């Protein structure tokens, strides 16, 4: 690979690293807020996504060659809001990454002869697009009162003990372990 020092791609990698690192922290804060509001699954999804953002940051960081580098970039300077507000803010950030920032960074990397880095920006965009969709779907569920209630009978799983309940609404208290509704999620059989 050609020398990265002094290229626009080097700055883009550091910008992406900083953005992913900050997103990771924001998502851990958002996870705490969701848990406090009674959305355990959404809290866990924020935490899972934070871990994925850490891996994106690590991938970008490993391309860098050391030294000092000054970048100028804009980052969200928001607050920790309600779960709904946090989901919407997270989705907006993810959309910006997959639809604008990373495609632009990939193009620049390829123009500068860094095809592998360009490909990595494109592949991480795929993950960011899925993060965006998941956050928007979860926000719609929160906004429409559909986190613990569905339009038809489905299976709900207690995330604490594994008890399965069938109905259009998750039970208020798990009859097996006595944990509140906050610990229920739609049963996924995706194995």
Tell me what each language-model feature is.
Residues 1-191:
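Non-heme di-metal
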């Amino acid at each position: 690979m050609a020398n990265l020092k002094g290229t626009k791609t080097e700055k883009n990698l550091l910008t992406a690293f900083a953005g992913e690192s900050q997103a990771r922290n924001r998502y851990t804060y958002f996870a705490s807020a969701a848990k406090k509001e009674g959305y355990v699954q959404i809290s866990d999804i924020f935490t899972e996504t934070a871990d994925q953002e850490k891996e994106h940051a690590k991938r970008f960081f490993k391309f860098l060659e050391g030294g000092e580098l000054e970048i100028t970039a804009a980052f969200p300077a928001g607050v920790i809001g309600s779960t709904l507000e946090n989901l919407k803010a997270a989705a907006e950030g993810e959309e910006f990454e997959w639809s604008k920032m990373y495609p632009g960074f990939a193009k620049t990397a390829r123009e500068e002869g860094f095809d592998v880095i360009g490909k990595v920006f494109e592949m991480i965009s795929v993950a960011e697009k899925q993060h965006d969709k998941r956050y928007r779907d979860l926000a719609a569920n929160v906004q429409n009162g559909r986190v613990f209630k569905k339009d038809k009978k489905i299976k709900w799983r207690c995330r604490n003990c594994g008890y399965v309940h069938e109905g259009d609404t998750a039970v208020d208290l798990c009859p097996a372990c006595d944990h509140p509704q906050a610990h229920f999620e739609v049963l996924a059989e995706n194995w």
